A protein has these predicted regions:
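Signature of lipid phosphatidyltransferase scaffolds
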Residues: 2-84
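SF2 helicase/translocase NTPase motor core
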Residues: 107-127, 133, 154-156, 162-286, ...
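Walker A/P-loop
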Residues: 140-160
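Conserved helicase ATPase motor motifs in RecA-like P-loop NTPase domains
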Residues: 288-305
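Conserved helicase/translocase motor-coupling segment
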Residues: 379-436
Length: 436
C-alpha cells in the first residue's frame, strides 16, 4: 500500500464436500509489520515460480500454453479420488473435537500456555512442572537450569518449548547441544512433546528414526538457520570459525537454548583482569544480544572457579552493579562470614539486587517474625542509605539476618533453578517414584 506495508498468504480454503470430509485445510496470513521475514520468504518463493526458476516446476505464460496446446494433457474425466490416497478411515467426532480443542485452547483461555504442559505425553515431577510454569509466566526471560544430573532438565525444557510453540508465543528457536546428545534430544522432543527439531549438521537436515536416519537437503537460496521453527545443532559445529559468524548474522531469535552450558567458559582463571573467552562463550555473548529469551542448562555451573558462574549469569543479564567481576567476587567471598567483609561493596550490590528484584519475600516474612518490623527495617534502611557503620551496632541476631539476606539476594537464586538428588528420596517417600 502507500505506506509500504504488505501481506502474504499461503494455503487454501477448500470448501468442497471432499475437503470437508477428507482434507486438512490450512490458511496462513503474514503481515509485513509483524513478521516481515515470512512475507519476504513467500515473495521469494512466488518469484522463483513466476520466473521459472524453481527446480521441478515449469511456468508457462498463457499464450505459450495455448500455442503448445497444453490442455491436451488434461484427463478427459476429472479424478474422483486423488492419486495415492487409500480408503478414508473415519475417526470419531470426539477425537477430532479434542484435537481441534488442543490447537485452539491456548488462544481461548487465560494462561492458555499451560495447555502445552498439561497435554505432554508424560506426567512431570512437581519441580519440573514448577520450573516450566515459572519460566512461562515470566517469558520472555533468561534463566539458568541447574538441576543435578537425573532431575530432568531436558523434561523442563521440553515442557517449556512445547507450550511456547503450541501457544504461538515463539516463531523460532535455536537449540545447541553436544554432538553426542543430538539424537537423544531429537527423539525425546518428538516422542514426549511432539516437537519436531530437525538436526542441522552444516550441510543438510537430519532426522533420526530409530536405527535409521533420513536426510533433507538445504533449500536453495535460504538461510539454513531460518528454515524450521526449531533448529537443533551441535555446539561444536556452531562455534567453528565461519559457522559462528553465519549464525550471528542470521538474525534475531525468540528463544536460544544451550545444553551443557558449562562448556562456555573463559580460558584461564589466574587473573580477572585478563578475559579470554573460549569460542563457545564468545558465540553465546553474541547470541544473548540477538535473542529475546535464553535458557542455559548445566548440572555443574562451577567446575573450577566461582567466576565461571559469573560468566554464565552475565549472559542472562546481571543487574548493572553486579556486572563488574571484581565486585561479584568480593561479594561471593563475603558470604563466607569472614571478619574482613567489604561492607561498602556488599551494600552497593545488595541495594542493586533489591532494586532489580525486590526483597526476597521469604526472608522478609521470616525476619519480620524473628526481629519484628522495626528490626527488619533497620537492616533494610542501612542497605538503602549505604550506612555501613550501622553493621557494627547491629545485634548478633540482626547481623545473622543480614547474612541470610546476603545469601538470598545474590543473583544465583533469582536467575537459577536447582533441584538436588535428595528430592528424589522425597518423591520415593511420597509414592511418586516406584523405585529408589
Amino acid at each position: 500500500d502507500e505506506h509500504g506495508d504488505s501481506l502474504a498468504f499461503t494455503g487454501s480454503i477448500n470448501e468442497s464436500l471432499t475437503a470437508w470430509k477428507n482434507n486438512f485445510e490450512r490458511f496462513k496470513v503474514f503481515l509485513s509489520w509483524d513478521r516481515p521475514r515470512d512475507v519476504e520468504e513467500e515473495q521469494e518463493a512466488f518469484d522463483r515460480l513466476w520466473e521459472n526458476a524453481e527446480p521441478g516446476w515449469a511456468t508457462v505464460n498463457l499464450p505459450e500454453a495455448v500455442k503448445q496446446d497444453l490442455i491436451k494433457y488434461a484427463p478427459n474425466e476429472p479424478p474422483t479420488v486423488e492419486p495415492g490416497l487409500g480408503p478414508v478411515v473415519e475417526e470419531s467426532i470426539k477425537s477430532r473435537w479434542i484435537a481441534q480443542f488442543l490447537r485452539d485452547a491456548p488462544y481461548l483461555v487465560q494462561d492458555g500456555w499451560k495447555v502445552g504442559v498439561e497435554t505432554a505425553a508424560l506426567d512431570p515431577f512437581p519441580h519440573q512442572r514448577s520450573v516450566a510454569y515459572d519460566v512461562l509466566s515470566q517469558f520472555p526471560c533468561k534463566k539458568l537450569l541447574a538441576d543435578e544430573v537425573g532431575l530432568g532438565k531436558t523434561i523442563e525444557v521440553g515442557l517449556i518449548l512445547r507450550s511456547l510453540l503450541l501457544s504461538g508465543r515463539i516463531n523460532n528457536c535455536l537449540l545447541l547441544v553436544p554432538r553426542s546428545l543430538v539424537k537423544q534430544w531429537q527423539e525425546e522432543l518428538r516422542d514426549k512433546f511432539l516437537v519436531d527439531a530437525p538436526f542441522y549438521d552444516g550441510s543438510k537436515f537430519v532426522y533420526f528414526e530409530g536405527n535409521t536416519t533420513r536426510s533433507e537437503p538445504l533449500p536453495s537460496g535460504r538461510d539454513p538457520w531460518r528454515v524450521h521453527r526449531v533448529t537443533l545443532a551441535s555446539a561444536q559445529m556452531a562455534k567453528m570459525s565461519g559457522r559462528s559468524e553465519a549464525l550471528l548474522n542470521s538474525g534475531e531469535w525468540d528463544l536460544v537454548i544451550l545444553d551443557e552450558a558449562h562448556h562456555a567458559r573463559r580460558r584461564d582463571f589466574a587473573t580477572l583482569n585478563r578475559y579470554r573467552p573460549n569460542r563457545l562463550l564468545r558465540l553465546m555473548e553474541g547470541l544473548t544480544e540477538r535473542t529475546k529469551a535464553l535458557l542455559l542448562m548445566t548440572a555443574t555451573p562451577m567446575q573450577v572457579h566461582p567466576i565461571e558462574v559469573y560468566d554464565l549469569l552475565r549472559l542472562l543479564g546481571l543487574p548493572e552493579k553486579w556486572q563488574d567481576p571484581h565486585s561479584f567476587m568480593e561479594y561471593i567471598t563475603s558470604l563466607r562470614e569472614t571478619d574482613d567483609t567489604t561492607w561498602g561493596t556488599v551494600f552497593s550490590l545488595l541495594d542493586s539486587s533489591i532494586e532489580h528484584w525486590g526483597v526476597d519475600k521469604s526472608w522478609e516474612e521470616s525476619c519480620g517474625r524473628a526481629l519484628g518490623p522495626v528490626g527488619r527495617q533497620r537492616i533494610l534502611n542501612a542497605i538503602d542509605f549505604g550506612n555501613t557503620s550501622a553493621v557494627y551496632s547491629f545485634k548478633d541476631s540482626e547481623r545473622e539476618w543480614l547474612r541470610q539476606l546476603m545469601r538470598r539476594q545474590q543473583p544465583v537464586p533469582w536467575m537459577t533453578y536447582r533441584s538436588t538428588r535428595p528430592l528424589l528420596r522425597q518423591y520415593f517417600d511420597q509414592g511418586l517414584l516406584k523405585q529408589n
